[in-house]
Amino acid sequence: MIKQTLREFARSNKTIFLDDFMKIAHQDKKSGYYTTKKPIGKNGDFITAPEVSQIFGEIIAIKIIEKINQLNVTQFNLIELGPGRGSLMMDIVRVLDNFLDKNIVNYSLYFHEINKFYINKLKTIFPDSQIKDEFSDYRNQYTIFIANEFFDALPIRQITKRNDIFFETAVKINEKNKLELSYVEPRKESLEYIN
């Protein structure tokens, strides 16, 4: 299903730049990897530190408590980007709720998640939380972001240099109607940060 979406995009655009390819493959609403599958956990494709041990989340919670005490913060946003099944935040919240005096310090819990299965699970586990898809939707107050393995899944642009010529990685359809890597002239904006 996702291959068909990618082929159609490649046919209409000649090539798919790597960042567009990754965005479609990961985030397509109908068949994207992170939007339609359950990739995390024993029955998924990978596990993350919070799935193995609660100590990772507990250490993060202790650092949060240290920081808000140091800065005398009484209200803050706690936002997790790409929380998956919510394992990390369960560990963090458990420690925060045990050690923060709710009469003095309050936090608003938010998630930035695109997977429909995980969104439903998060709503069940954290009924007082909010799930957002725009960064402008958060309260304007002290904010702590948690992003365990979130950036690993973001689309990237890849530039290579061969014989003093820059190329940008893309995907195209070959003569056998298969998707294959290609190295093409970079988009102008892709070269802006290269000296």
Language-model features: locations:
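Class I S-adenosyl-L-methionine
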Residues: 7-8, 20, 139-142, 146-195
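Rossmann-like AdoMet
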Residues: 1-81, 85-129, 133-134, 138
